[in-house]
Amino acid sequence: MRSATVVTRFICGAAFLLTLGWGIPVHAQLGVGEWVRTDATGKGMTMTVAACCKGGFRLTYRVPIANGQPPLILTVDLPMDGTEVPTMSAGKPTGQTMSARRVDDHHYTGVVKQNGQPYLTSNATLSADGKTMTIEDTLTGTNQKVIETWVKK
């Protein structure tokens, strides 16, 4: 069974990075919709991106859990202005926050904190057609990296 901390460690980099590039009107509709994580570590995870919060995005993750249990559902309302925002599960904060910055039209960077302490940095690259996002997550204080691949449905 995947714990919420392990799961969110691998998906939170994508949470805000996937949509960060669409915080300006020209790109506003590119990120909205359903995304599927296709790498081996995150296979089966989905993310729904919807507009919210004055030009930001609501991200809803569905994370498969072993033994036929219902999926873990995580939600974050991301204002897209670099503000730290909480990750929610069942309407309650998980103790995790996210913040992010857009570098350019196809590159994004961000930090995920757990209980106020940074534990994950992410660098993302959006494909030219806007249909694939590759994210390199690095655990704070280690050389451990996870490469995520998300594809728009």
Where are these regions (language model features)?
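Hydrophobic small-molecule pocket/channel-lining residues, especially in calycin-type beta-barrels
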Residues: 27-153
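N-terminal secretory signal peptides that target proteins for export/translocation
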Residues: 1-8
